[in-house]
Amino acid sequence: MVTIRADEISNIIRERIEQYNREVKIVNTGTVLQVGDGIARIHGLDEVMAGELVEFEEGTIGIALNLESNNVGVVLMGDGLMIQEGSSVKATGRIAQIPVSEAYLGRVINALAKPIDGRGEISASESRLIESPAPGIISRRSVYEPLQTGLIAIDSMIPIGRGQRELIIGDRQTGKTAVATDTILNQQGQNVICVYVAIGQKASSVAQVVTTFQERGAMEYTIVVAETADSPATLQYLAPYTGAALAEYFMYRERHTSIIYDDPSKQAQAYRQMSLLLRRPPGREAYPGDVFYLHSRLLERAAKSSSNLGEGSMTALPIVETQSGDVSAYIPTNVISITDGQIFLSADLFNAGIRPAINVGISVSRVGSAAQIKAMKQVAGKLKLELAQFAELEAFAQFASDLDKATQNQLARGQRLRELLKQSQAAPLAVEEQIMTIYTGTTGYLDSLEIGQVRKFLVALRAYVKTNKPQFQEIISSTKTFTEEAESLLKEAIQEQMDRFLLQEQA
């Protein structure tokens, strides 16, 4: 029989008592009253913060949005099909945040910064709040550097600067996303990090954009944040803020970033759905009263940092879809009033074969020529003026039967200038090539050509200058000025190429 030794037992008990660590943990918990349509009503959670993350018993995460006297309205970041009435919920004490790092470049992620491209986890040592305050007045400086889009119509007449917010607006199928993706393609070698946020888009459209970026080598400096049309409303609402947090990470590290929101009107619809289900009072077009704040707090995060903060920048290009050209609807007017200008794409121009279908007359950039290099300012002024006069004359010429020679010449020049602005998709032009193209048009060299020959000649001219007059591009890129030497080189090249071109056309 085993003998029991009391001293051993007492020693063991004494050791256990010494090692005992009394830990009191207070957990803020609640109970699910009802759940459905991506919304849960919770009883309890007395000390929960607005916007705090809460965790359900089966692992789903939600955000506390409505704090009422007897319950808390929570939006779910998932389908919530396993949540049951009466199950427990605990507050996490955290506000929504995401991991951030350089490793996100080249990846496709969702609104929670989780990879969805099947290429494994993303390593990150830092994190940022999804919602963070916009830089103050002292933290900013005025916009002065250009963000080249590669599109002649924009870079010459509606210039975008680094740190600006420029709205791209137009009906469906007018090439809005194409303008934005061309801008990303043009940032190759410009040391600009790009973030493309797809909100409520078709998965096939997002896949097409990602494929274009991969084929053109643009994914190296791009992050794609995607929440497609079948995603829960909560995640569609969060996606733009996730993209902004990633862009801010690079901006505060003294880098230049560009972020495209495609499109905020889908985010507003997701927010409207959440708000109505939370029984918040509806306002105009059934949107909640704070839908302006939804977009203003997002777009105000775009900035050009002051020299003390390293002069990084975040340029925002929101895309808004209009219904049959109605820019006076609620969301378009809101976003127009927040941004520093808009690029208006017209369905009529698109159908007339003018692509990109930018309506130069009503598009505007409130930063203006401050966001252009000197060489572009020198040649673009005349282009703007001549196109404006042409638009006026064209409307008048429809009613007049006999026009004098000067008017006919002006109309002919305008038609050739309009032709010069046409570009194929995914074919952005370097600023030197744009300057060369605009100069050729505004100085009348294209007047002798048929309208159908203009684009063919310009393609040949750009190739000719690249191979035979490389000094032209060197002068523009080094001095940023259209010098007399550059002008004489260009004149020679145009004349030589014109002679060759006319001979080829006759042959």
From Swiss-Prot:
EC number: 7.1.2.2
Gene Ontology molecular function, alphabetical: ADP binding; ATP binding; proton-transporting ATP synthase activity, rotational mechanism
Annotated site location: Required for activity: 363
CDD domains in the record: ATP-synt_F1_alpha_C, ATP-synt_F1_alpha_N, F1-ATPase_alpha_CD
Keyword Thylakoid among record annotations: yes
Record's catalysed reaction(s): ATP + H2O + 4 H(+)(in) = ADP + phosphate + 5 H(+)(out)
Membrane topology classification: Peripheral membrane protein
GO cellular component: chloroplast thylakoid membrane; proton-transporting ATP synthase complex
Lineage: superkingdom: Eukaryota
Subcellular location: Plastid, Chloroplast thylakoid membrane
Pfam families given in the database record: ATP-synt_ab, ATP-synt_ab_C, ATP-synt_ab_N
Enzyme class, spelled out: translocase
The entry's keywords: ATP synthesis, ATP-binding, CF(1), Chloroplast, Hydrogen ion transport, Ion transport, Membrane, Nucleotide-binding, Plastid, Thylakoid, Translocase, Transport
Record bears the keyword Lipoprotein: no
Parts forming coiled coils: none
Chief site of localization: plastid
Intrachain disulfide bonds: none
Family: Belongs to the ATPase alpha/beta chains family.
NCBIfam families: atpA, PRK13343.1
Assembly and interaction partners: F-type ATPases have 2 components, CF(1) - the catalytic core - and CF(0) - the membrane proton channel. CF(1) has five subunits: alpha(3), beta(3), gamma(1), delta(1), epsilon(1). CF(0) has four main subunits: a, b, b' and c.
Its job: Produces ATP from ADP in the presence of a proton gradient across the membrane. The alpha chain is a regulatory subunit.
Protein name: ATP synthase subunit alpha, chloroplastic
Lineage: Eukaryota, Viridiplantae, Streptophyta, Embryophyta, Tracheophyta
